[in-house]
Amino acid sequence: MKETKVVKFGGSSLADAKQFKKVAEIILDDPTRRFVVASAPGKRYVEDIKVTDMLYKCYEMASEGQNFDEQFQMIKDRYNNIIMDLGIEDF
């Protein structure tokens, strides 16, 4: 039976485009890594906010009936920056 690995990456290992590229190399270096679970990007620097924490904040604000558009835009911006820095154009 062919060995198959499930691997999970997230947090600082997916914090920015540079880290995404490192993760891609890790995955491609081992053909048994066939299933990849990606969680939310973490901090890029000490004062940064983890995406998970931003998502919790959106939930908290929504639960209290507050407008969370600005908070959600920060999450979208984080992912869009990663996409742009990876040079992905057709998204």
Residue ranges and their predicted role:
Residues 1-91:
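Nucleotide/pyrophosphate-binding catalytic subdomain
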